């Protein structure tokens, strides 16, 4: 209510709805307000997730105090926002206007995704060394499978997140809201995102390989156990057979 009274801006009731259609997430109102709803990654170790953020930007209606002010609505703090605030304090001239703020947020989100991918590489390298060592128990294999599955989930979230960032940046470029320098920066962000796509694809292949290798070691261990039981059964067969023969009653067998 305060925002509407002071800035003349109405926050849509469905600002945080989980819409999938692009037309419902990136659009321009008749009054010139730009609406962008985009997801930002939180690579939490225990609960990785994406957070929906809604942005509203008035670039045309100079009669309102909201002119040139970027409004953001989100349910929790996002690492990318904290990172940009820190950079802005260190370099006051970094953000020249609201459009630059929005663009830098998407740039930082792509950078954050890249850093998270590097962390996934490190985690998978540790798992790979353990699996390929050949000395893996079932308990160790179970832990490795759990670790690999968590990295697969995070990798999938990154892939979806950068896809969403690409759509948001492309919308900003199509809306003709960026100056020449900002437009070139947006193109660079898209190039960075394209490079991340190949990394996520490679990680999916590596994850599948490690999962297959781990499951293979589990099967080998199980086959060893079955073989031990089979040998034990054969070794115990003669005494069992003799005991059975001695336990038979031959008196009423006509063949004898």
Locations of regions flagged by a protein language model:
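Long amphipathic alpha-helical coiled-coil segments
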Residues: 168-183, 210-221
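Peripheral, non-transmembrane regulatory/ligand-interaction domains of membrane transport proteins
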Residues: 1-174, 178-179, 188, 192-195, ...
């Amino acid at each position: 209510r305060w925002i509407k009274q002071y800035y003349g801006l109405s926050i849509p009731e469905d600002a945080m709805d989980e819409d999938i259609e692009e037309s419902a997430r990136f659009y321009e109102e008749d009054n010139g307000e730009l609406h962008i709803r985009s997801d930002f990654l939180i690579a939490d170790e225990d609960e990785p997730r994406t957070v929906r953020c809604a942005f509203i930007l008035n670039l045309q209606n100079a009669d309102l105090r909201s002119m040139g002010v970027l409004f953001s609505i989100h349910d929790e703090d996002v690492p990318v926002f904290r990172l940009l605030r820190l950079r802005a304090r260190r370099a006051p001239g970094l953000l020249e206007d609201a459009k630059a703020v929005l663009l830098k947020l998407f740039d930082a989100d792509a950078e954050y995704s890249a850093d998270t991918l590097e962390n996934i590489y490190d985690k998978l390298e540790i798992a790979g060394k353990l699996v390929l060592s050949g000395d893996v128990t079932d308990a160790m294999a179970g832990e490795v499978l759990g670790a690999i599955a968590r990295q697969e989930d995070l990798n999938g979230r990154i892939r979806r997140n950068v896809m969403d960032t690409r759509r948001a940046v492309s919308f900003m470029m199509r809306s003709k809201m960026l100056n020449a320098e900002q437009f070139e920066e947006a193109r660079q962000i898209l190039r960075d995102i394209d490079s991340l796509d190949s990394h996520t694809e490679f990680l999916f292949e590596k994850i599948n390989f490690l999962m297959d290798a781990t499951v293979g070691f589990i099967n080998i261990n199980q086959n060893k156990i079955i073989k031990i039981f089979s040998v034990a059964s054969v070794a115990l067969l003669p005494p069992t057979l003799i005991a059975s023969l001695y336990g038979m009653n031959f008196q009423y067998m006509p063949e004898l």
